[in-house]
Amino acid sequence: MGKDTIADLLTSIRNADMNKKGTVRVVSTNITENIVKILLREGFIESVRKHQESNRYFLVSTLRHQKRKTRKGIYRTRTFLKRISRPGLRIYANYQGIPKVLGGMGIAILSTSRGIMTDREARLNRIGGEVLCYIW
């Protein structure tokens, strides 16, 4: 039985966001590095650094906390992450069938033959792949 590193990454980010933690530490793999780079590029994460501890590499990510002011006071915006394709049920989509998350407001992360990319990049390159997760 294998370990789902993508689900571990998303759960760590979700838990840190809910508990108002500033940083997240996850095990570094090629897939998690590429997903974190996409989150950094899209503005969900402020910064990322690679940390070595006893022959294992970890990614230490600083989360971006946005505060908005309303009549009732200041509240934090939440980042929603949802795992779509999982080890027990893989979900694939061609470039025409790539779903738009919240009508284009969110992003879908895909694993394609040209690497891990967002739904917009996959549509521009006209390639499909495995839908890993939704982020909005």
Curated annotation (Swiss-Prot):
Gene: rps8
BP terms from Gene Ontology: translation
GO CC terms of this entry: chloroplast; plastid; ribonucleoprotein complex; ribosome
Keyword list, A-Z: Chloroplast, Plastid, Ribonucleoprotein, Ribosomal protein, RNA-binding, rRNA-binding
Record protein name field: Small ribosomal subunit protein uS8c
Main location: plastid
Pfam families documented for this protein: Ribosomal_S8
Key word Chloroplast present: yes
Subunit annotation: Part of the 30S ribosomal subunit.
Protein's UniProt keywords contain Plastid: yes
SUPFAM superfamilies: Ribosomal protein S8
InterPro entries named in the record: Ribosomal_uS8, Ribosomal_uS8_CS, Ribosomal_uS8_sf
Subcellular location: Plastid, Chloroplast
Stated family: Belongs to the universal ribosomal protein uS8 family.
Biological function: One of the primary rRNA binding proteins, it binds directly to 16S rRNA central domain where it helps coordinate assembly of the platform of the 30S subunit.
Annotated GO MF terms: rRNA binding; structural constituent of ribosome
